[in-house]
């Protein structure tokens, strides 16, 4: 009797489970775009219903997707939740998409986390990719170049960047000497991040930048609260229910963006109080001046309230990536002291000890330049670009890609592709030198992916490369970096928009000589 009662109950359960399975199957099938005749969809590995491939991505999506690309090719599709995501690997494929078909792939997906960056109006993160966006991007690029890498007629330095970096590098050397005389050790990232923030702050705001204020120091030293949630594949962007559950990382991200925006708004407003259009001294002043002219219809005129959004993007372009690059460089140098000695030998031979390095010395310091390139490649600390999206239906490598498809660009895979590098796991700066060892192999150096490509390429790329070079040249000319014997330096990247290394508080710096 009991058995006969349980049979209908079991049948009901099976029927319900079958109905749910069919519903999920048809929902997922219905969400797939219709592929035009003669084309095919990108290959897609098996994924869990409702979850997709989120479990496969794990804590290091760049590694998981690189392994997938070996099996499925340079163009593949995954699902995070029910959202299809196109994943591009391989340098040729990425160049085809972002450069040759740049208009098709220049969009940004409308992701939940992006709405908290400058209230959803960030030039870098917002979905906008129309004429107004393009005009403001050009304006931001021109303002950044004018007050960073363009010549400075009022200074003995070759440009504003050289003037500010030289000043901050010397201040950093003095600060490190004080730390060595006191505690006897330091955390390199904590020190470098302040110096880099002061450089971009001076270029953005001139004398109005609150250098070393408690508020500024708190923001720059906690920038990890931004990068951990702005990374590609953040589950909160694909599973709406996570927005309503306890999420400490998301709360930190929201709070950081609010604090950073208030900080910039306050600094921009104070700057505007004594703005003189006949004496523009910094990036924000250039934006103020531009907001007073230009036909509105063309998108060249910036409303005053939008200036802080551009400043936010420019500050970001000239801050986190550069600080992370310098910090990674120092980590490699203490683990490979023979490379540090070769760089210092080159600096001594080319520059000597009577003056500081300048940007004009860059062509004569190929080994230092090769070391920087290898740091960019080996660390690949920007594993993905900010996600792209397609602006219209298109094809790539024979695959049909629908409009508004989210696209991940795997820069890490390009920088560790054995077909490009032969021995990608080895840290070998010499790979970027010509056979004579006197110049950089330019075609090979252009295969590194760190700043993106095409219409969304980072506007701070040139600034970043120049600034990293000059900071390292000045620091390594005067200081020798090391860690005590027995101290292990962990070079395992921590995944994020920019990947940081584990903090090392045992750095030491010995003064080689000083320049008055």
UniProtKB/Swiss-Prot annotation:
Its cofactor is heme. It holds the Pfam family p450. Glycans are attached at residue 69. Substrate binds at residue 226. Gene3D superfamilies: Cytochrome P450 (1.10.630.10). Heme binds at residue 458. One of its GO terms (cellular component) is endoplasmic reticulum membrane. It catalyses: an organic molecule + reduced [NADPH--hemoprotein reductase] + O2 = an alcohol + oxidized [NADPH--hemoprotein reductase] + H2O + H(+); 17beta-estradiol + reduced [NADPH--hemoprotein reductase] + O2 = 2-hydroxy-17beta-estradiol + oxidized [NADPH--hemoprotein reductase] + H2O + H(+); 17beta-estradiol + reduced [NADPH--hemoprotein reductase] + O2 = 4-hydroxy-17beta-estradiol + oxidized [NADPH--hemoprotein reductase] + H2O + H(+); estrone + reduced [NADPH--hemoprotein reductase] + O2 = 2-hydroxyestrone + oxidized [NADPH--hemoprotein reductase] + H2O + H(+). Pathway: Cofactor metabolism; retinol metabolism; Steroid metabolism; cholesterol metabolism; Lipid metabolism; arachidonate metabolism. Liver. GO terms for biological process: arachidonate metabolic process; cholesterol metabolic process; estrogen metabolic process; hormone biosynthetic process; progesterone metabolic process; retinol metabolic process. Its EC number is 1.14.14.1, 4.2.1.152. Keywords: Endoplasmic reticulum, Fatty acid metabolism, Glycoprotein, Heme, Iron, Lipid metabolism, Lyase, Membrane, Metal-binding, Microsome, Monooxygenase, Oxidoreductase, Steroid metabolism, Sterol metabolism. Transmembrane segments: none annotated. It is a peripheral membrane protein. GO terms for molecular function: estrogen 16-alpha-hydroxylase activity; estrogen 2-hydroxylase activity; heme binding; hydroperoxy icosatetraenoate dehydratase activity; iron ion binding; steroid 17-alpha-monooxygenase activity. Its main location: endoplasmic reticulum. SUPFAM superfamilies: Cytochrome P450. This is Cytochrome P450 1A2. It comes from Macaca fascicularis. The lineage of its organism: Eukaryota, Metazoa, Chordata, Craniata, Vertebrata.
């Amino acid at each position: 009797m009991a058995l006969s009662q349980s049979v209908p109950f079991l049948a009901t359960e099976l029927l319900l489970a079958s109905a749910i399975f069919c519903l999920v199957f048809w929902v997922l099938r219905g969400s797939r775009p219709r592929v035009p005749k003669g084309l095919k969809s990108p290959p897609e590995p098996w994924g869990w219903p409702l979850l997709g491939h989120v479990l496969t991505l794990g804590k290091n999506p760049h590694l998981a997707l690189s392994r997938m690309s070996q099996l499925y090719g340079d163009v593949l599709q995954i699902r995070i939740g029910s959202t299809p995501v196109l994943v591009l690997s391989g340098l040729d494929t990425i160049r085809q998409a972002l450069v040759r078909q740049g208009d098709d792939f220049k969009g940004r997906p409308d992701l939940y986390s992006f709405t908290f960056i400058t209230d959803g109006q960030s030039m870098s993160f917002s979905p906008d990719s129309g004429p107004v966006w393009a005009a403001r991007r050009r304006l931001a690029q021109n303002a950044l170049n004018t007050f960073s890498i363009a010549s400075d007629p009022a200074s003995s330095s070759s440009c504003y960047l050289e003037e500010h970096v030289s000043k901050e590098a010397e201040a950093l050397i003095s600060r490190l000497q004080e730390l060595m005389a006191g505690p006897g050790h330091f955390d390199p990232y904590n020190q470098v991040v302040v110096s880099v923030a002061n450089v971009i702050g001076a270029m953005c705001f001139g004398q109005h930048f609150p250098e070393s204020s408690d508020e500024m120091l708190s923001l720059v030293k906690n920038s990890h609260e931004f990068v951990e949630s702005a990374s590609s594949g953040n589950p909160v962007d694909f599973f709406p229910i996570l927005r309503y559950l306890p999420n400490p990382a998301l709360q930190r991200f929201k709070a950081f963006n609010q604090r950073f925006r208030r900080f910039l708004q306050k600094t921009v407003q104070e700057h505007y109080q004594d703005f003189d259009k006949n004496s523009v001294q910094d990036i924000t002043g250039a934006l103020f001046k531009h907001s007073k002219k230009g036909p509105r219809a063309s998108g060249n005129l910036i409303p005053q309230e939008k200036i802080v959004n551009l400043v936010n993007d420019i500050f970001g372009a000239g801050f986190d990536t550069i600080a992370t690059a310098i910090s990674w460089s120092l980590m490699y140098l203490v683990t490979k002291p023979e490379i540090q000695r070769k760089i210092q030998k080159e600096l001594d031979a080319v520059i000597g000890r009577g003056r500081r390095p300048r940007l004009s010395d860059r062509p004569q310091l190929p080994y230092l330049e090769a070391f920087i390139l290898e740091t960019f490649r080996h660390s690949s600390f920007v594993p993905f670009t900010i996600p792209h999206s397609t602006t219209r239906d298109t094809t790539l490598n024979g695959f049909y890609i629908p409009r508004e498809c989210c696209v991940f660009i795997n820069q890490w895979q390009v920088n560790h592709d054995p077909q490009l590098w032969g021995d990608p796991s080895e840290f070998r700066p010499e790979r970027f030198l010509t056979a004579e060892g006197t110049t950089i192999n330019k075609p090979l150096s252009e295969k590194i992916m760190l700043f993106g490509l095409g219409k969304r390429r980072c506007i701070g790329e040139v600034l970043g490369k120049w600034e990293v070079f000059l900071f390292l040249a000045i620091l390594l000319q005067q200081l020798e970096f090391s860690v005590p014997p027995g101290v292990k330096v962990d070079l395992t990247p921590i995944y994020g928009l920019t990947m940081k290394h584990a903090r090392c508080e045992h750095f030491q710096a010995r003064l080689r000589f000083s320049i008055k």
